[in-house]
Amino acid sequence: MRKTRFLTALTLCSLFPVSLTAQSITPVPIPQPMPIPHPVINISQPLPVEVPLPHVLPVSVGDYDRDLPVQEQETIQKSFSFSGAPHKSLEIDNVWGSIEVVGTNSDQVQLTVNKATRAESKDKLEQARKEVTLDITEQQGLLKLYVNGPFRCHCDDGCGHREFEGYVVKMDFQLRVPRDIDIKVKTVNEGRVVVRDINGSFLVRNVNGDIEMNNIAGSGTARTVNGPVKVAFRQNPQEASDFQTINGNVELRFTQGLAADFRFKTFNGSIYSDFPVTALPVRAVQEEHRGAKVVFHADRYTGVRVSSGGPEIKVENLNGDIRILENHE
């Protein structure tokens, strides 16, 4: 087994575009190459940048640790049929809790939700029953599961910060679905996302928790903020894919015969590859004028090619390592 290791010192600015006023523009030092182990990759100079924090938390994480003596447990079980549907899609929009999706050879969807409510009083428990609901939308070939409540807003992320309501409702989703299904699933707090045995496209998001995917044969995006991202492919992706975290390692496992173009970003971490790679040229910096401002979109990715190249696979993190490994399972 040949493992290629190349240390990187990529910058925080590589994660976000930099906006400068026309009066405050100063010359940017030309990036200088650094000698590192094979393959040789040029490392960019650091630039200051301000990192926006995620704004998707419905309540603070500490709310779940409050003294909430009144508790209630409930199990929701339902089944749905995708028989005869030419295209199958699943969407889950959770807030508190985990998500597990496992592919099967059946056309049926088996849903189990373990709902746990913790409240300050019986009145608050009754309030939680009324305010927090699981909305289910079933159409031809499409199943949507949406956790609704007073924490929801009409912003792009679907939830916003509110004062503590006096209760916390956690829903853990477990689903058995057809293998050839496209999935869009996300959660925010107190849960991990696990996906196994899926052949379709995927969009997987988390905030405070890890993402683990195994035996995957599709292409897509997996992103979290606080936690690792681990994906093992049964069949290498045929289309562009994207994997990202801020605090955690990213570990991707591919089968033999991998041919792809990788573009990496990391700040505090190293990049490892089981596959021999060759360096790709650095892409040009893009400059955009917006009135009195000049916005620089600098491509600070480290680009490498595996074999003859193929779909572009982007991998980003801030604090953690990136590992590109060969899947022997």
Where are these regions (language model features)?
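Intrinsically disordered, low-complexity terminal regions
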Residues: R2-E329
